[in-house]
């Protein structure tokens, strides 16, 4: 079942950890593409110097962060790679969780074509399908078109994985500093990256 609106409310760090093991789903041209979330990063603007919304900075790009939890915040890095975030916290509190890595589940042929334009992949290429924020967006067909979309929609949502199928029994959740935020002064050291230790699709050990 889809995660209800209440799933995204509450402390952003707790929501980030709850997202691990759940399934990110995007329906593209009627075909379901999905993956199990294995790595995330929490961003707690306006006090977090690593957040786009640090200091309450409000722009056309970040406006969705100030809205209701349970919406998609998508942005571009380096002018070419999309990053997908889940908005958390109450209206007016611009916080969110970046989805950093997935284990592919549904629509794997479409995911392969989206990433490599072929379906016969090496083991290394397969592991690289969704082990990074830009890679998973390309794989699932997530673009700026999805910015601001409610995660209650039929085409883009988080699917809750039943306890008996949840991979949390196989992997330990580890916390550590977030990646590629050297500009963020003391926030560089916040242990707000959460991932399944030892999972093959985690982007960085």
Swiss-Prot record:
Record family assignment: Belongs to the DNA glycosylase MPG family.
InterPro entries attached to this UniProt entry: Formyl_transferase-like_C_sf, MPG, MPG_sf
EC number in record: 3.2.2.-
Upper lineage: Bacteria, Bacillati, Bacillota, Bacilli, Bacillales
UniProt GO MF annotations: alkylbase DNA N-glycosylase activity; DNA binding
This protein's record includes keyword Chaperone: no
NCBIfam families linked to this entry: 3mg, PRK00802.1-1, PRK00802.1-3
Protein name: Putative 3-methyladenine DNA glycosylase
Key words, A-Z: DNA damage, DNA repair, Hydrolase
């Amino acid at each position: 079942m889809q995660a209800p609106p209440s799933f995204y409310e509450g402390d952003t760090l707790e929501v980030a950890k709850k997202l691990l093991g759940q399934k990110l789903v995007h329906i593209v041209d009627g075909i379901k593409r999905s993956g199990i979330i294995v790595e995330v990063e929490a961003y707690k603007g306006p006090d977090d110097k690593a957040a786009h919304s640090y200091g309450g900075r409000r722009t056309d790009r970040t406006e969705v962060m100030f809205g209701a939890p349970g919406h998609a915040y998508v942005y571009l890095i380096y002018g070419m790679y999309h990053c997908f975030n889940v908005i958390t916290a109450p209206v007016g509190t611009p916080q969110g969780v970046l989805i950093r890595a997935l284990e592919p589940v549904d629509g794997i042929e479409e995911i392969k074509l989206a990433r490599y334009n072929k379906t016969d992949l090496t083991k290394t290429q397969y592991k690289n399908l969704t082990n990074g924020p830009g890679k998973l967006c390309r794989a699932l067909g997530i673009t700026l078109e999805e910015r601001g979309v409610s995660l209650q929609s039929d085409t883009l949502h988080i699917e809750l994985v039943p306890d008996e199928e949840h991979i949390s029994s196989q992997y330990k959740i580890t916390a550590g500093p977030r990646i590629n935020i050297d500009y963020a002064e003391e926030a560089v050291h916040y242990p707000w990256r959460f991932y399944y230790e030892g999972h093959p699709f985690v982007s960085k050990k």
